[in-house]
From Swiss-Prot:
Segments for region (Disordered): 27-80, 94-116, 142-161, 166-195, 279-323
Disulfide bridge partners, by residue number: none
Family matches, as InterPro entries: Znf_C2H2_sf, Znf_C2H2_type
Protein name: Krueppel-like factor 14
Biased composition (Low complexity): 40-53, 94-106
Gene3D superfamilies per record: Classic Zinc Finger
Any one GO molecular-function label of the UniProt entry: RNA polymerase II cis-regulatory region sequence-specific DNA binding
Entry keyword Zinc: yes
Membership in a protein family: Belongs to the Sp1 C2H2-type zinc-finger protein family.
BP GO terms, sorted: positive regulation of sphingolipid mediated signaling pathway; positive regulation of transcription by RNA polymerase II; regulation of transcription by RNA polymerase II
PANTHER family: KRUEPPEL-LIKE FACTOR 14, KRUEPPEL-LIKE TRANSCRIPTION FACTOR
UniProt gene name: KLF14
Lineage per the UniProt record: Eukaryota, Metazoa, Chordata, Craniata, Vertebrata
Chief localization: nucleus
Length: 323
């Protein structure tokens, strides 16, 4: 008797476990017209579309098969009628679950694996397909399972985020120095003024000895360069001063302006005059000791038009050399 009671208790426990694992079939509310109300209340009817498993994570595949346990004796059934009712209810639920799968024409999903996930951008959003725990698996982009996921580095504050999910940390770095920059020129140290004036109280010094000799004549009052023009007894300490004075007698004007026909006897007078022209440039005038080639400006538009019409162009700029 004790073995039969233990068997019935075990059977009742199995029934309760199977009932808790199975799908619950709710009764549908009656339609407004009253038609089709009894069809949904039948125990063996197919469940509605809302009760069918969706494309999300699958639930239990099917109702597990009940263990084959010998039916209780009539005496035991009278002693425990609730066990008999539980067994009958479990049989009805098992048969109704199998009939629903056969009527719907869909094979139950295998509980060991997932089906192909539906892309989120095509069908429905991920929040409707799966809960928060499974949304990452369904909405993940199609990629190789062997390729490791590379986490993106956090973007620095203020740096623009690059397209594709990469951080813009590399953009915040300073610009690289140009590789083809011109090399720096060495600073030219000026030569020392070695020729100092020997007279007391005079601190002047010169690069050349000839310049020092000319300066010493200012202390001694010596004027070795005298003018040989008739009735002219002027004397000078420097030869260039004598040459400049001599032109006042001859009237020679060897310094001509490159922008106009004017001529001058002194180079400083020419420079002062040439600066008044708006198109003047220092390279237009050659002085003694200048090594650069003078720059010749292109002819003006008016001169080009006049030469094309047949008239001769204006006088070409002449370059002279100072003594």
């Amino acid at each position: 008797m004790s073995a039969a009671v233990a068997c019935l208790d075990y059977f009742a426990a199995e029934c309760l476990v199977s009932m808790s694992a199975g799908a619950v079939v709710h009764r549908r509310p009656p339609d407004p017209e009253g038609a089709g109300g009894a069809a949904g209340s039948e125990v063996g009817a197919a469940p509605p579309e809302s009760a069918l498993p969706g494309p999300g994570p699958p639930g239990p595949a099917s109702v597990p098969q009940l263990p084959q346990v010998p039916a209780p004796s009539p005496g035991a059934g009278g002693a425990a009628p609730h066990l008999l009712a539980a067994s009958v209810w479990a049989d009805l639920r098992g048969s109704s679950g199998e009939g629903s799968w056969e009527n719907s024409g869909e094979a139950p999903r295998a509980s060991s694996g997932f089906s192909d996930p539906i892309p989120c951008s095509v069908q429905t959003p991920c929040s409707e397909l799966a809960p928060a725990s499974g949304a990452a698996a369904v909405c993940a982009p199609e990629s190789s399972s062997d390729a490791p996921a590379v986490p993106s580095a956090p973007a620095a504050p203020g740096a623009p985020a690059a397209s594709g999910g990469f951080s813009g940390g590399a953009l915040g770095a300073g610009p690289a120095p140009a590789a083809d920059q011109a090399p720096r020129r060495r600073s030219v140290t000026p030569a020392a003024k070695r020729h100092q004036c020997p007279f007391p109280g005079c601190t002047k010094a010169y690069y050349k000895s000839s310049h020092l000799k000319s300066h010493q004549r200012t202390h001694t009052g010596e004027r070795p360069f005298s003018c040989d023009w008739l009735d002219c007894d002027k004397k000078f300490t420097r030869s260039d001063e004598l040459a400049r004075h001599y032109r006042t007698h001859t009237g020679e004007k060897r310094f001509s302006c490159p922008l106009c026909p004017k001529q001058f006897s002194r180079s400083d007078h020419l420079t002062k005059h040439a600066r008044r022209h708006p198109t003047y440039h220092p390279d237009m005038i050659e002085y003694r000791g200048r090594r650069r080639t003078p720059r010749i400006d292109p002819p003006l538009t008016s001169e080009v038009e006049s030469s094309a019409s047949g008239s001769g162009p204006g006088p070409a700029p002449s370059f002279t050399t100072c003594l």
